[in-house]
Amino acid sequence: MNGDRLRAFVALMPDAASRDALHALPVTRGARRTLPAQLHMTLAFIGAIERERCDALAAHLPALAVAHALPSLPVERIAWWPSLPRARLIVAELAADAACVALNAGLAALLRELGVPADRRPFRPHVTLARLPHDAIGQPAHGGAPGRPVEVRVEALTLFESRLSQEGVSHRPIVSAPIAPAEGRTPPR
């Protein structure tokens, strides 16, 4: 991107223990795993955005994070997306908790208010575990069951810049705001 625009997205960042648990979930042989530090749950893919609008969004994210405490989110299943046989991703699908859905709706309203165009696909909470090669065949491991209970504890709402290079995609945090755990829930460790 040029100096006036960048590629951006907003995501929830799991804590380190959750990223380790997600990284340990089974994926198909030959899949390119997402590095643990890069595991995240995208709320809004923005794409190309002017720096000025990106700065405005960054200024509003901490207030949005403070307004939305989140419980731990259980992994419901492991799936291949978009669908077999054309799957490109292996994802951990997470429960669509009401608090998470409300946060996503608040973010969508903020993006509209700031005039920031975002992906209009329905919100499906997930974490991308791995990317599949173009010639991948097969089914999700264990019929999609994670094999053991995994709950994702979210620690931050983060605006990322997405950078493309010869080595692949990397994500650089622009601003990250803490998300409080919902009251009465102790995050699993």
Set out the residue ranges of the language-model regions.
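Histidine-dependent nucleotide/RNA phosphoesterase domain, centered on the 2H-phosphoesterase fold
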Residues: 1-189
